[in-house]
Amino acid sequence: MLLRKSIPYIKICRDISASVRNNKEIAQKLPLSVPLPMENNSKSIEKGCPPMGRNSRVTRLPNGLKVCTEDTYGDFVTVGVAIESGCRYENGFPFGISRIVEKLAYNSSESFSSRDEVFAKLEENSGIVDCQSTRDTMMYAASCHRDGVDSVIHVLSDTIWKPIFDEQSLEQAKLTVSYENQDLPNRIEAIEILLTDWIHQAAFQNNTIGYPKFGNNSMDKIRVSDVYGFLSRAHTPQRMVVGGVGVGHDEFVSIISRHFDLNKSTWTTQPTVLPAKIPEIDESRAQYTGGELRLDTDLTKLTIGKPYPLLSHVVLGLEGCSYKDEDFVAFCVLQSLLGGGGAFSAGGPGKGMYARMYTELMNRHHWIYSAIAHNHSYSDSGVFTVTASSPPENINDALILLVHQILQLQQGVEPTELARARTQLRSHLMMNLEVRPVLFEDMVRQVLGHGDRKQPEEYAEKIEKVTNSDIIRVTERLLASKPSLVGYGDIKKLKDLRSLDQAVAKRDLKYLFN
C-alpha cells in the first residue's frame, strides 16, 4: 500500500532528474553570454502558492495612528513601531534621554512585573525584540511566529505606552549608556560610528540633527519624571507608525486598535509621574551650518596587540538633501558611484571594486587604508560625506584626494561608469528588501516620512533615469555649500576649515597644500 502511494512521487522525481539532465546538456553547449532556455511549467504554479506581488496597505486610525502591512511567505513575521523621536528632538530635555529610553525598553510595565516576564512571554511565541534609536527615529521591532502576533503586540504596546520606571532601572540604564560612551573610543570597529556622529555635529552645529548621540550627555540631570515627560511628548499616535510584514492587514489593524490606546498610557492614568513643566518637542527645521570638529588624540592604544596600523581619520561633509527632495535619487546614485570600502574585505574581494574610491584612491595610493562615501538624508536636510583613513603623516594628502574626487565630478562621468553605479544601486535596493526585517524598516520609515509606501520598482525607475547632467548638477549643489570637517587621531598635519573652505569655494586644491 505504501509502495503504491509512493509511485507517483518517484515518477515526479524521475521527471525532474531527466529535466535537470537535459538542461545540463544544453547548458554545456551554450556560451555564458546566452540565457538558458527555461521551461515555464504553469501547472506547477497553479498547484502551488500563487505569486505574491507588492501589496502594501496603509490605514489611518481615528486617533491619528498609521498602520501599514505587507504580505510575505513564511510562518514568521516582523512587527513593530517607528516613532518620530531621537536625539534631534531632545532640545529642552536633558541630552541623552533618547538613549536612556532605548535602554529602558522591554522592562517592567503594567502587564509585566519584570524583564524576565517579558521575555518569557516572547519565548512562548518564538519571539525576539529590539529597540534602537537614531537621530530622528525610535524603532521598536519584534520577529515572531505568526500565531503569536497578538501577544507580541501586547508586549510592544506595554513597553511603549505603559512602562513602569523606578530609580533602580533608571540608574541601570545610565550605567549602560555611560559604559558604551567609554567603550566606543576603545573599539576599532566603532570609529565609523563616532565619525558619523561628529560630522553631524560639525555640519549642523547646535541644532536638530547636529545634537550629539554619543558622549557629552547630561545623564546626571535625567530623572524618572523627565523620562515620562519625554515619552508623553514623543509617544503620541500622530508621531507613530505601526507596521507588520507577513501579517493580514485587517486582522492586524484590529489587534492594533485593541492595544494602542493613548487613554491607557501610564502618563495619562497616572499624571503624577510627570514633571511640573514639560518642554514641547522641538519641530524646528534643520539648519546646515558647516563647521569643524578636531579631535587630536593618540590612537596607539587601538593598535596594541592587534594587526591594525596606526591611522588618522578625516571626514569631509557637504550639504546634501532631504529624502523628500527631487534630487534624492541622484544623490544616492552619486554615492553608489563613489562607493568605497577598506583595504581588508571580509568575505573576499570584489565588492565595489569598480567604485571610484577604489579605482581612484585605494588602488593608486597604498597608504589609503579605507575610503568611503555616505549620503545621510533626513526629512528636511542632509549631509553628504566622504571619509578616508591613512597614516598620520598622510592625513592631509587624504583630504586633498577627497576634495579632488568631488571636484572632478564637475566634468561628468563615463556612460559605462554611470550605468554600473545605477545597476549596483538597484541591486542593493532589491536584494536588501528580500530580508524581512529590512523590508519592515523600509516600509514604516516611508510611511512615517512620506505618509505612504513607495514600491521599490518606483525607485528603480527613478534610478535608471539618472543622467550625467544630474550627476553634474548635484555635484555643483554640493560644492555650493560650506564644507564641514572632522579630524580624528594624530591630525597635526591636517589643514583647517578655512583652507578647506577656500579650496571648495574657488575649486582649487592649492589652498590645501602646505
From Swiss-Prot:
Interval spanned by the transit peptide: 1-55
Location in the cell: Mitochondrion matrix
Transmembrane segments annotated in the record for this chain: none
Keyword annotations: Mitochondrion, Transit peptide
Taxonomy, superkingdom: Eukaryota
InterPro entries associated with the record: Metalloenz_LuxS/M16 (IPR011249), MPP/UQCRC_Complex (IPR050361), Pept_M16_N (IPR011765), Peptidase_M16_C (IPR007863)
Gene knockout outcome: RNAi-mediated knockdown causes 63 percent embryonic lethality. Embryonic lethality is further increased in simultaneous RNAi-mediated knockdown of mppa-1 and mppb-1 or ucr-1 and mppa-1.
GO biological process: protein processing involved in protein targeting to mitochondrion; proteolysis
Family to which this protein belongs: Belongs to the peptidase M16 family.
Function: Substrate recognition and binding subunit of the essential mitochondrial processing protease (MPP), which cleaves the mitochondrial sequence off newly imported precursors proteins.
Complex and partners: Heterodimer of mppa-1 (alpha) and mppb-1 (beta) subunits, forming the mitochondrial processing protease (MPP) in which mppa-1 is involved in substrate recognition and binding and mppb-1 is the catalytic subunit.
Listed name of the protein: Mitochondrial-processing peptidase subunit alpha
Native source species: Caenorhabditis elegans
Lineage: Eukaryota, Metazoa, Ecdysozoa, Nematoda, Chromadorea
Gene name of the record: mppa-1
